[in-house]
């Protein structure tokens, strides 16, 4: 059964604190009639620090969509490979053991996808399948886990690599002056995450069931307005309240699996903002402490879009994981309004060691190639 292994995460070296964000807002929007409200909303996010791919002075300039997209491509090619290599090492696999790369990003555009460059540069087999996902926003982290689960269910000997690369700072638009835009300027950060889903063996979350749910008639609540200047992010004021209609979908998925969503051992969810976590605690009737990993990501990195779920899971690993067989929920939330949800149990490599030792890497690569040719 497919196992989601320890994620590798990297954030850029340029850091901006909440205090610096608030001061920038005061300086750049002195005469804005709703500045006090915007400042209060930014403070309420709880985001203490964010990491960005360029110095703040460069981020605040807008050289044009073309130049920004060049920065996206340059920084992705510079930073992603090391994150992938650590994820492969943590999963005890080689690049040639990977059968599919699922690449998610909503903050830049490349064609061919970065996956083609990665296959050429990092030694993945030329038959490696590519699944780039560009338009699911913050929900894409959960979607990538689910698509990897689906692939490994269809091909039980296969291994999937998930990569999330988000440079939200490249979407900053100095002419967007609505309160929602000012809030986003203090909420989003940049980050890269990668994780392997092994078809056999591995330590991590043994994925058992996944599902998706879209709240009807909410597709304009989170969206891009694409202009000559790039991606203009639009965030409706109703978004923070979306956990009330989404919580029943989480409960239903757990119920279909014979579980109670209010009585699980770990919760790894997208932290788009503090109210999402607070409301999930309320509507799922779960202790707020259960969402500590997601809240830590929000506090230290901000909303890093599709990479949030993987970073929160990384923090669970860093805490030492959980006991064998512990049951958990993973979920990403984003445009649509969409929830991508999965359920799984914790397993350690020792439990399935017999399986892993029966398949050498040479034999596994042979199986992998047969899967690709199927």
From Swiss-Prot:
One term of GO molecular function: acyltransferase activity, transferring groups other than amino-acyl groups
Annotated keywords:
Acyltransferase, Melanin biosynthesis, Transferase
- A single BP term in Gene Ontology: polyketide biosynthetic process
Gene3D superfamilies on file: 3.40.47.10
EC category name: transferase
InterPro entries, alphabetized: Chalcone/stilbene_synt_C, Chalcone/stilbene_synt_N, Polyketide_synthase_type-III, Thiolase-like
Question: In its keyword annotation, does this UniProt entry include Transferase?
Answer: yes
From what superkingdom does this record's organism come? Answer: Bacteria
Catalytic activity, reaction form = 5 malonyl-CoA + 5 H(+) = naphthalene-1,3,6,8-tetrol + 5 CO2 + 5 CoA + H2O
Any signal peptide, and if so, which residues? none
- What EC identifiers does the entry list? 2.3.1.233
Instruction: Answer yes or no on keyword Transcription regulation.
Output: no
Q: Which residues form the active site?
A: 138
Q: What is known to happen upon mutating residue 168 to S?
A: Still able to produce THN
Q: What is the effect of changing residue 171 to S?
A: Still able to produce THN
Family indicated by similarity:
Belongs to the thiolase-like superfamily. Chalcone/stilbene synthases family.
Briefly, what is this protein's role? Involved in the biosynthesis of melanin but also various secondary metabolites containing a naphthoquinone ring. Catalyzes the iterative condensation of five CoA-linked malonyl units to form a pentaketide intermediate. THNS subsequently catalyzes the dual intramolecular Claisen and aldol condensations of this linear intermediate to produce the fused ring of 1,3,6,8-tetrahydroxynaphthalene (THN).
Stated name of the protein: 1,3,6,8-tetrahydroxynaphthalene synthase
């Amino acid at each position: 059964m497919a196992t989601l292994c320890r994620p590798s995460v990297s954030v850029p070296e340029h850091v901006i604190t909440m205090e610096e964000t608030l001061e920038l807002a005061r300086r750049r929007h002195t005469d804005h009639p709703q500045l006090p409200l915007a400042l209060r909303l930014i403070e309420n996010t709880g985001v203490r620090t964010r990491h960005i791919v360029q110095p703040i002075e460069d981020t605040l300039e807008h050289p044009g969509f073309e130049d920004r997209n060049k920065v996206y491509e340059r920084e992705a090619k510079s930073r992603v490979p090391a994150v992938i290599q650590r994820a492969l090492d943590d999963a005890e696999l080689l690049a040639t053991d990977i059968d599919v790369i699922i690449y998610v990003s909503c903050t830049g555009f490349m064609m061919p996808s970065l996956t083609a460059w990665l296959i050429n540069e990092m030694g993945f087999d030329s038959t490696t399948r590519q699944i780039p996902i560009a338009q699911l926003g913050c929900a894409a982290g959960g979607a990538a886990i689910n698509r990897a689960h689906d692939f490994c269910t269809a091909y039980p000997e296969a291994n999937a690599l998930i990569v999330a690369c988000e440079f939200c700072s490249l979407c900053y638009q100095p002419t967007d002056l609505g309160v929602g835009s000012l809030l986003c300027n203090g909420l989003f950060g940049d980050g890269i995450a990668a994780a392997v889903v092994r078809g056999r063996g591995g330590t991590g979350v043994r994925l058992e069931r996944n599902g998706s749910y879209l709240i009807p008639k909410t597709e304009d609540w989170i969206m891009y307005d694409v202009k000559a200047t790039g991606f203009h992010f639009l965030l409706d004021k109703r978004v923070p309240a979306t956990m009330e209609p989404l919580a029943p979908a989480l409960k239903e998925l757990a119920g279909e699996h014979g579980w109670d969503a209010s009585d699980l051992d770990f919760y790894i969810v997208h932290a788009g903002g503090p109210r999402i976590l607070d409301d999930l605690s309320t509507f799922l009737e779960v202790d707020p402490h259960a969402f500590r990993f997601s809240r830590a990501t929000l506090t230290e990195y901000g909303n890093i879009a599709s990479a949030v779920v993987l970073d929160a899971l990384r923090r669970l690993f860093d805490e030492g994981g959980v006991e064998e067989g512990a049951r958990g929920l993973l979920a990403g939330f984003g445009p649509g309004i969409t929830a991508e949800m999965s359920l799984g149990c914790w397993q350690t490599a020792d439990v399935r060691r017999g399986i892993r030792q029966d398949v050498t890497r040479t034999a596994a690569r042979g199986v992998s190639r047969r899967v690709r040719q199927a």
